[in-house]
Amino acid sequence: MSEFIKTLEILGEKIELGESRTIDFNIAKLYTSTNIEIPIIIERSIHPGPTVLITAAIHGDEINGVEIVRQLISRKINKPKRGTIISIPILNVFGFLNTDRAFPDGRDLNRSFPGNRRGSLASRVAYFFTNEVLPHADYCIDFHTGGASRFNAPQVRINPGDKNLLKLAKVFNVPFSVLSKNLKKTYRTTCNKKGIPIILFEGGKSLESNSQIVNYGVRGTKRLLYYLDMLDSKFNVTNPSRDTVVIEKSRWIRAQKSGLFHLKIKCNQLVEKGAILATITDPYGKMKFNVMAPNKGYIINVNQAPIVHQGDAIFHISTKDNQPKEEEREMLNE
């Protein structure tokens, strides 16, 4: 545990207890020789404690996470009562500049971990982050959104069978906690291999700033910091109105036809088997195809594209869930 370390050293700079520091992680240059830097904002209490690492924009087009971390910094939630909070609002600066998910070479940073110091640009960023920043963390929070036009209900993703992570997910308490296996070369997998608990938050869609999603992320972070006895006493933590729903299994529903896509339900909604989720029509008024729920479950992702192709992922639905009480069901359907 880092709570016994008085002097924190990141990228050659030493930060003592009680200090605030912003370190610019210089990763590369633009074609114009302009430096590209990743600001790392470090806040240390005078009182020792754990270190929480908060990151966003591993994918450069995922704006909700950037706004969540910005609010944490702006509202000084990142100034801990004890311990250290390291905040990186934009990890993929190249992608953010281009409002693009990937790096300029098309590489996905979240498929490049733990990285290689002589590899692609994305791999180099992953390498230096993994070796220079991540080792200081006792807990990680990583903010994401759905890709393209796919809107994610507020959820955290955790490894099946990890009781400690499930406990932290229940503390974070967004509507859903989805049990999902780690993918190779992801940040989450790297944390898992190093034994660092990570809460991966998903909410909303790319290239959008959604105030409701942002509020879920900010409130969840406050709850987790409060649980770790790191949240300053000037901040209030509201008791959640309901427990997170644990999604043990889920599946994607794919479009059986190509055409105009008309949604009939909302993300977050609990639907019955056979419920009409959407219709797909041709542009000429001759074809209409109903997309029906294959089972009872929660809709945790909705494709909001106006046009879909056959085979496109259009809904993510739970196939095994904890059924809510009646009043909780009403809240989910709001």
Over which residues does each language-model region extend?
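Structured catalytic-domain cores with a bias toward divalent-metal coordination
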Residues: 1-334
